[in-house]
Amino acid sequence: MPGPTQALSPNGENNNDIIQDNGTTIIPFRKHTVRGERSYSWGMAVNVYSTSITQETMSRHDIIAWVNDILALNYTKVEQLCSGAAYCQFMDMLFPGCISLKKVKFQAKLEHEYIHNFKLLQASFKRMNVDKVIPVEKLVKGRFQDNLDFIQWFKKFFDANYDGKEYDPVEARQGQDALPPPDPGEQIFNLPKKSHHANSPTAGAAKSSPASKPGSTPSRPSSAKKAAPSSSASKSDKDLETQVIQLSEQVHSLKLALEGVEKERDFYFGKLREIELLCQEHGGENNDLVHRLMEVLYASEEHESHTEEHEGEEQVHEQPSSRRSTDSRSVSDNFHFV
């Protein structure tokens, strides 16, 4: 049996080479590499347990520069790693075959698309026996500190497992554009503010209207005065054209935003519908938890206040049969689709 400082490889062999590296404990496993194909069998990963911040910890700027250099990306902030796409390609680079890049959404912009990528990453971790729990719910929110902590751990994991073999990230993505996700604080709803004075139709009209004095009618207007209305009118037309272009861009942006919101709505509605069907299947078992879930699903907006919720619970205990009457309704009754 191995001693307290020894570890067993997946083959059952003693592996007495645990490394202590500035607060980072690295427990190596056996890695079998077939030259030419880089074929990995499951259980090959070198697990890294980061216990403290060391001098080797990279700054936010250095870590983003490293990600962009390795994967040929154009990320500008640590928060943009919340899509999970970069981690998926890192795993393909370290352990070819453990993840399918065709399934990775490199242009993910919505939270459920981020979750999809992290599910693929978690599956690849499981295949390679990576002993790391991915805090998906925190990462997909795009908060800086959560994403910085995870990428700093992943950098140490990468250094412990990378064998130095050349890797073409663009070719591996098979032509997929790896666009960085939108910044959490700069969503598509935050359209640029425009000056009402500079772009308003009345501003151009005010500039174009020539000043005239009542009662003074020049008998012979000069050529310069004749050219003035023409030039001011063309300037007004240009201002209007610019405004039309800006408004068209706003309409396009709002359409994209609406499509994203509708996708999220359909996604979460589908989840609620699945929960409803499960509750209906077990509704006849007189399960209190099922009835409570049904009450939450069918609760309308006016019944969601804290006070009325307590009153509803008291009525439920007094009249148990009233809870079962909600089974005839559907969760779709609380959704209004345009």
Swiss-Prot record:
Start and end residues of each stretch annotated as Disordered: 1-21, 171-241, 300-338
Gene3D superfamilies linked: 1.20.5.1430, Calponin-like domain (1.10.418.10)
Bias kind Basic and acidic residues: ranges: 300-327
Alphabetical list of PANTHER family matching this protein: MICROTUBULE-ASSOCIATED PROTEIN RP/EB FAMILY MEMBER
Stated role: May be involved in microtubule polymerization, and spindle function by stabilizing microtubules and anchoring them at centrosomes.
Primary localization class, coarse: cytoplasm
Keyword Nucleotide-binding: no
Gene coding for it: MAPRE2
Regions of compositional bias (Low complexity) in chain numbering: 200-234, 328-338
GO cellular component: cytoplasmic microtubule; microtubule organizing center; microtubule plus-end; spindle midzone
Localization annotation: Cytoplasm; Cytoplasm, Cytoskeleton
Keywords assigned: Cell cycle, Cell division, Cytoplasm, Cytoskeleton, Microtubule, Mitosis
Pfam families: CH, EB1
Residue ranges annotated for the Calponin-homology (CH) domain, each copy included: 57-159
Alphabetized SUPFAM superfamilies for the sequence: Calponin-homology domain, CH-domain (SSF47576), EB1 dimerisation domain-like (SSF140612)
Similarity comment text for this entry: Belongs to the MAPRE family.
Name of the protein described by the UniProt record: Microtubule-associated protein RP/EB family member 2
Entry GO MF terms: microtubule plus-end binding
The EB1 C-terminal domain, residue ranges: 236-306
GO biological process: cell division; protein localization to microtubule; regulation of microtubule polymerization or depolymerization; spindle assembly
Free-text note on domains in this protein's UniProt record: The N-terminal domain may form a hydrophobic cleft involved in microtubule binding and the C-terminal may be involved in the formation of mutually exclusive complexes with APC and DCTN1.
